[in-house]
Amino acid sequence: MHFNNFLSNKTRNHSFSKSKIDNLNSIPFSKDDYKILESPITFRETLLKLINNAKSRICINALYLQHDEAGIEILNAIAQAIKNNPNLYVRIYVDFHRAQRGLCGKGPQIGNNVWYQQFAKENNLSLNIFGVPVKKREIFGVLHLKGFVIDNTVLYSGASINNVYLQKFDRYRIDRYH
């Protein structure tokens, strides 16, 4: 059965026509304007290079910025970028609940939020890291966006910032969505 048979008449009447789609706001780009990064190592290296060369802004959305070697590497790069350019616009958005804790199953740990505060104090920085509470309890939903805007470059990813997703060592998590 064709999908349209499941739609109500009201829905069908409000569907997008080609002319409506053509009139939506957009940013045109060609195939030469984007690149697919095919490995987590390439992604991490590209992210670090962009951060190190940032001139105007660094905006990061991630489920979490983990207090591990990869997270430290990224946060150190951001701190250095701020020191090199004090007028750099930096905003990092992470899930509120994930920032309150460390890794599950690793025993007692300080939350990532405490690490962010300690890092900022030790480096004499004003870091804008925001915990976004999507729901009142983590079990009901989290901020799961993963996007990076550095100057005029946009990186989309399925990776949060930690050792496993950025393949800091020999381990890498391959998600089932491929």
Identify the role of each PLM range.
Residues 1-3:
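Non-Sec secretion/translocation targeting segments of pathogen effectors
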Residues 6-53, 66-178:
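HKD-type phospholipase D/PLD-like phosphodiesterase module
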